[in-house]
Amino acid sequence: MESVCMCVELHLPYHLKWYWPADGYRRPEISSYFDQERIFTDFQHMAASISRTNKVLTRSIENGAAYTLNLSGTFLDQCSWDPRVLNSFRDLADTGNVAFAASTYYHSLSALYPDLTDFKEQVWTHMEKISELFGVVPSTFVNPELLTSGNIGGVLKKLGLTCMIAEGARNLLNTDMPVSVFSDDIPTLLRHIDLSEDISKRFSDKSWDDHPLTADKFASWIEHIEGDVITLYLDYGSIPWNESKAGGMFQFLKDLPLSLEERGISMIRPEDAIKRFEKVKLDTLKTESAARYGMEGLLGNHAQHFYLKQLEIIVQELAARTDLSENGEMKKIVGYLQQSDIFLDMNTANITGYEKAVNNLSILSDFRRAIWEGRT
């Protein structure tokens, strides 16, 4: 193996309320539909661990690591509650070996709409926000849930993006391994599922045969895999969580670049990988859809499909109402209603999946009526 790309995602959703329709319809406000107390509590909990975690990532970078950060727009909105959080990420950016990925601003599935206008606007908004906050222009794109759908490559290239990261799903790879820069419309790195989850999910599992996982052990596994680049994709929250559960995660990240370097393996950013390695054509990137943990988690039942279709209609209806579409509160509401987390909550594999579907569709109905009536 020649190299490793490591991308870390930090997304905190705007949770929907359990919604009980009052007499008539409500005035469309964020507080009407979203559980602000829970959102703030979750942010405070994450914020408490960010400074320490980012100091660990800084030490890792000093030892030769490179990271790509995917900070969702919903998380960046919440950072207004504590400017120290953004300053911590600015300090990380100042190390010079951190890239920031672009995504849909509201962590949405807008890439699945037949009309990609809203998708394009959300990606551009996210790119502008990253540039404003950190002084860098993203070149790598990551769809929420590592979603890939074959019609977005052209849009991404027009926005100036040069590559993307997606799920290393079996229906994309067939018999191939996710160890190359793949290409169809746009160069694509595919997440190595097993190695990513060895870090994010199994690291603190004391019943796991490979516990404890050291950097040296992990690097030795990578050394014996043939290929150009392995892409690791982690949830940011898994880093402090694993450290608190069993310890060792912080030391693992500090040591990993050194252990890889001893074996002649470098940690690089996606934009470096696409320049260094020959692209391997993968036709399924244009013909198949895939997402982290499977498309069925997002769109596996009627309620999820219906919610997506209603969103598509609402986005178009709001855009057509210039008197409403320029209202900042309305724009944020329709954005937050598109979060991928809402679809995952309606998965009937969850014990509350049916209840969530009824709840979420009720909120959507209330908001759509507000557009019809011109209520703000």
Predicted regions and their residues:
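Catalytic domains of cell-wall/extracellular-matrix polysaccharide-remodeling enzymes
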Residues: 115, 121-176, 239-256
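A structural motif corresponding to the C-terminal end of an alpha-helix
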Residues: 46-67, 91-97, 129-136, 224-225, ...
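Alpha-helical scaffolding within the catalytic cores
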Residues: 52-55, 80-93, 172-183, 213-221
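Metal-dependent polysaccharide deacetylase catalytic core of the NodB/CE4 family, i.e.
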Residues: 67, 73-145, 187-202, 236, ...
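An acidic- and aromatic-residue-enriched active-site/binding cleft used to recognize and process polar
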Residues: 8-13, 72-74, 103-108, 143-149, ...
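Generic structural signal for well-ordered alpha-helices
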Residues: 53-57, 86-90, 120-130, 153, ...
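N-terminal catalytic cores of secreted or lumenal carbohydrate-active enzymes
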Residues: 1-104
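Active-site and substrate-binding clefts of carbohydrate-active enzymes
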Residues: 2-48, 178-186, 190-191, 205, ...
